[in-house]
Amino acid sequence: MKTSRGATAVQMDEADVKSAYRRWAPVYDHTFGRVAGEGRKHAVEVINQSSGRVLEVGVGTGLSLPDYKSSLEIVGIDLSPEMLDKARERVAEEGLENVNGLYEMDASELKFNSNSFDTVVAMYVMTVVPDPAKVMRELARTCKPGGEVMLVNHFSTDDGVRGWVERRMAPFGDKLGWHPVFDTDRVMICPELQLIEKRALRPWGIFTMMRFRKALTAG
């Protein structure tokens, strides 16, 4: 498939994602977990200014769980059972009583009622799912009216060496387990979500935080 930037991308499916994260699970915390740590920390700091129920989609090994304030009720989901095993170990070892469930679940088919969470956050998720549009609609559906949907993610660029590398990596997305070429317009699809903040994050601005507010009424 050709992307809007002219790179040839491959379609990923659930098996590709599970296979990739089965390989990553044993070393995730010490590799990508470190690279993405600053963005994850910043997102949780923002969420900690809110209250109520939080759904973390793509909770992984639970790296963010100890950083949420104790008054928030946290629910996490992930497609990888290996990642979730590590997250559950973390919850038990650190006594995180505000974590109220970690579930193996497909982000494109969330098993929660509509309007269930005050905040829905997906960190480093949108480039690893086979159908980002479907996932985005599920994030919006499960968020309460007036609540917030937050993304932290890599979004591609046309510029310089980084853009050149992303385009060269695009055909290998199924093996990498993520889409190197991924535009912001792929998540700007839900009319009920208003973008309230977009910010490049440290280090180096590779990752971006996007915050959306869900409309109080449909339409």
Feature annotation, model-predicted:
Residues 119-131:
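A short SAM/SAH-binding and catalytic strip from SAM-dependent methyltransferases
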Residues 34-52:
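Conserved alpha-helix/loop element of class I SAM-dependent methyltransferases that forms part
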Residues 55, 59-109:
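Class I SAM-dependent methyltransferase SAM/SAH-binding core
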Residues 22-33:
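Class I SAM-dependent methyltransferase Rossmann-like catalytic core
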Residues 133-145:
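A short glycine-rich, Lys/Arg-flanked "PGG" loop and its adjoining helix->strand segment in the class I
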Residues 1-24:
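N-terminal, positively charged/glycine-rich alpha-helical extensions of SAM-dependent methyltransferases
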